[in-house]
Amino acid sequence: MVVTRAWSRRMLVTDRHDLQRFVDAQSEMFDEVRSELRAGRKTGHWIWFIFPQFNGLGHSATARQFAISSREEAAAYAAHPILGPRLRECISLVNAIAGRGIRHILGTPDDLKFRSSMTLFAQVCPGDPIFTDAIGKYYGGEFDALTLDFLRSS
């Protein structure tokens, strides 16, 4: 394998943020996640590592373990060769669900976590409309105010 300088830099950023924790958590569950989203209803416990949110918004040990701590980490997650495509695939599956609100699809409070996650990624990936499409479809275009506050103060 030829390692380019750009690839090396991306991997250093990825390693610095320990994104492997997300890859590891997803490895055994990703097929189940896809299946649940295709069926239009989340039933498992995976929201934290599929749709991560900014640090400080979740209070459980799992939420803290999978919290995104900076804009740079969120950008690295979105650009990661495994996590980025999986994130977009899952958002596409959610966005393709017709006739159901996000609370029915994800349950509560996971509907709030999804909004927070979409807000975070929309802010760090402004050229990628998939995040704002989800906000538009399920939240009337209203971003999560707490996530925006955390991003402003970080």
Feature annotation, model-predicted:
Residues 3-31:
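Extreme N-terminal tail/first-helix region
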Residues 23-36, 94-102:
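Short amphipathic alpha-helical segments and their helix-coil junctions
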Residues 34, 75, 118-119, 136:
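Amphipathic alpha-helical segments within well-ordered protein domains
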Residues 36-71:
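Hydrophobic/aromatic-rich, well-ordered segments within soluble, folded domains that form packed cores
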Residues 56-62, 122-131:
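Short helix-capping/linker segments at secondary-structure and domain boundaries
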Residues 67-86, 138, 145, 153-154:
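C-terminal end-helix/capping segment
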Residues 76-121, 125:
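Mid-chain, well-packed structural core segment of small domains
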Residues 126-154:
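Charged phosphate-binding loop/patch that engages nucleotide di/tri-phosphates or the phosphate backbone
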